[in-house]
């Protein structure tokens, strides 16, 4: 893989998304993307191998055409389903004065993988919380420091069920590409949070097609994560049943007229739907539709609150960040703001061509890949000038409502809803995005990774996969 190209694959329940990006000084420049809708994935996992493989193959081809990049290697996103999050430490010794480099950091992190004692799981991500040089000097990045005796790391660990890992990788590599590494959504979500949110304690809610994923960050690090088998498909099912129409029609009206906050929905927007048990068509208003949507989205949020309670997380001072495909619905922010006391925002990636919440996971996978490359010294060159990319952040004024559940001061009693509206985010069918950059010029100006660094990346995950089948 060329040093400046990162390719991520997000295998979601409704679609497979591929992003080709490159690192520049302040972030990621998206070169091209592909998206293919599929029925081969259920609850975030492979349901029909052949259908899923074809969707992955198609979206890789689309991203390759859009970016002008011959895609051979990818970084794969994995869902939170079947994962365990815990803390671990490891230490390596030095017997002479040693300047710490990326190889030493990789060695001390890799040692944690061998300590995994959760049966039938494989460690996929080890993220350093702090390094300790010579047992007393705590640092965030020890590269270029001199160690006389030891390097210790205290890290967070994400392990996933081996069967999930094997099947996901097998399906992707059946498309003729190599998986360089995998990153859990639990870790990826950290890149969509501000430093303040991560420090104070923030909850990410990713409402997808079949699954809603929840991750909580505090003091700058991932604390825990979980998933709920209730999401966008359940909203559509409720609409289909409530309006007595087909699932396909319900999905269409959800995207065109859907509103998750009843008090802000319009009774002037009228649409008609065909009935499943007759040839008649019936008229409904957006407010009629919102009645079904609000009830289900509210239930999803209540399930999220239950997850936080089960994890013992009673403070969400950094706020709630909602993303994923169902975050496109109007009124989601208003509804959650009406249920909690802390701030709420909808996260949408800022990069041109992927400004939809459903691309959050795919672009975050690239962010994670770059972060680890820099930590391990794989990436040493910045090819771009300093270009500031400012992300839109939606704030909600702090509210002093009483807590509805004792001890959970982010949860508040239902109050009179305000009649406010959100700007609708357009949702289109399968698209291939291409940036306005001159890709030919990029190819001429950039270099390939040196062979030794490429070997490091390739062998790292190959060794992991071999160990799974031993």
Curated annotation (Swiss-Prot):
GO terms for biological process: cell division; FtsZ-dependent cytokinesis. Pfam families: FtsA, SHS2_FTSA. Residues 416-470 are annotated as: Disordered. It is found in: Cell membrane. InterPro entries: ATPase_NBD, Cell_div_FtsA, FtsA/MreB, SHS2_FtsA. The keyword Cell membrane applies. GO terms for cellular component: cell division site; cytoplasmic side of plasma membrane. Keywords: Cell cycle, Cell division, Cell membrane, Membrane. It comes from the Bacteria. Residues 425-434 have a biased composition (Acidic residues). The keyword Membrane applies. Its main location: membrane. Belongs to the FtsA/MreB family. Cell division protein that is involved in the assembly of the Z ring. May serve as a membrane anchor for the Z ring. Self-interacts. Interacts with FtsZ. This is Cell division protein FtsA. It comes from Staphylococcus aureus (strain NCTC 8325 / PS 47).
